[in-house]
Amino acid sequence: YIINVPPRCPPGSKFVKNKCRVIVP
């Protein structure tokens, strides 16, 4: 899912286009 958060993303996520892309199994 994609969430709007600061550059400090949760572990296992990538900061792309001012958004954090988190891949969930």
From Swiss-Prot:
Tissues expressed in: Expressed by the venom gland.
Protein name: Secapin-1
Location of this chain's protein in the cell: Secreted
GO molecular function: serine-type endopeptidase inhibitor activity
Keyword Disulfide bond part of the UniProt annotation: yes
Pfam families (alphabetical): Secapin
Keyword S-adenosyl-L-methionine: no
Disulfide cysteine pairs (residue numbers): C9-C20
Recorded superkingdom: Eukaryota
InterPro entries in the record: Secapin (IPR020128)
GO biological process terms, semicolon-separated: defense response to bacterium; defense response to fungus; innate immune response; killing of cells of another organism
Keywords (A to Z) from UniProt: Antibiotic, Antimicrobial, Disulfide bond, Fungicide, Hemostasis impairing toxin, Immunity, Innate immunity, Protease inhibitor, Secreted, Serine protease inhibitor, Toxin
Family stated for the protein in its record: Belongs to the secapin family.
Organism name: Apis mellifera
Protein function: Serine protease inhibitor which exhibits antifibrinolytic, antielastolytic and antimicrobial activities. Displays antimicrobial activity against bacteria and fungi. Likely functions in the innate immune response to microbial infection and possibly in the venom, as an antifibrinolytic agent.
GO CC term (a single one): extracellular region
